[in-house]
Design a protein with these regions (language model features):
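Short, charge-rich amphipathic alpha-helical segments embedded
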Residues: 42-60
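Structural detector for internal amphipathic alpha-helices that build alpha-solenoid repeat scaffolds
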Residues: 1-11, 29-44, 63-82, 89, ...
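Buried hydrophobic core positions in alpha-solenoid tandem helical repeats
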Residues: 14-19, 50-55, 86-88, 115
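Solenoid-like repeat scaffolds
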Residues: 23-27, 56-62, 89-96
């Protein structure tokens, strides 16, 4: 344990902080996008699950909302099978499932074509 590790927050706290930013509908889009990429960087199933919370809010203007959601979708699909458990967990607890279902479908179709 070095001196800097004392001041670093735990991965759980980092995920929770990024989750709050990614879900902020009235905040700056740059903050949401940076938080999304931070969650992708962390890369754990919990971080991906937190990232999926971006799909639970709507942002004005709707074109910005659509762009951000498309970007999150692409990044989740890139994770492939590593994102499946988080997607399934999200689908079991949330009502807004359009984007996560789309991600899961793309991941599973890609896997099917690779086999």
């Amino acid at each position: 344990m070095n001196l800097l590790s004392i001041f670093r927050s735990s991965p759980e706290k980092q995920i929770e902080r990024a989750r709050k930013k990614v879900k902020e509908p009235h905040g700056d889009s740059a903050n949401r996008i940076n938080a999304a990429y931070r969650l992708l960087e962390i890369g754990t199933p919990e971080a991906v699950l937190a990232l999926l919370d971006r799909f639970t809010i709507n942002v004005s203007p709707s074109s910005q909302d659509e762009e951000e959601k498309e970007d999150v979708l692409r990044q989740i699909v890139k994770r492939g099978e590593r994102a499946v458990s988080a997607l399934i967990k999200f689908l079991k607890r949330e009502r807004q499932v359009y984007w996560p279902v789309r991600a899961l479908k793309e991941i599973l179709l890609t896997k099917e074509f690779e086999e």
